[in-house]
Amino acid sequence: SRDQVAAVRPALESSHAGRWWHALPDGRIQCDLCPRDCKLHEGQRGLCFVRKMESGRMVLTTYGRSSGFCIDPIEKKPLNHFYPGSSVFSFGTAGCNLACKFCQNWDISKSQDMDRLMDQASPEEIARVAAEGGSRSVAFTYNDPVIFAEYAMDVADACHERGVQTVAVTAGYIGEAARRAFFAKMDAANVDLKA
């Protein structure tokens, strides 16, 4: 319901420490989240636009911020053998590490207007709203959850504490170390291969 979706809007900090990166000898940092290996100067963002070098470290600028929340049938993800007939609490952020010309969510995935991410929610609030609203799962969707992996993984932990499953709808364009950590937290995934 709209009330459930509206219930997930607290104020959160604007950036969150990123996990997959390392410092380079020339003062830049390299993002190791996906195979693009973006090399960033202070204040610069990667191709995904949501991972940034800030104060000499990698930060995720969309942690706790969403392009919107929606309750969908699980078949819309599309998953037909994962709790068929159940509701899934779906959300995404902005940005993407791909640039598909055929993207159906380009207004979200390629948005550089972070202010349009009006819906804010902590991992615990997402899990609570999903559980209280009767959703069997939470889906990370609309844009690729790989780029907000830290947030998705924290949401997954909070969901699992409440018995709520998690679903990643992704292209799977992710580095090996991040891939192992990310998918270890997911209960189901739709890996949408891009061609």
Enumerate the language-model features and the residues they cover.
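Flexible, acidic/Gly-rich N-terminal and inter-domain linker regions that tether
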Residues: 1-86
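Short, intrinsically disordered, charge-balanced linker/junction segments flanking boundaries
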Residues: 189-195
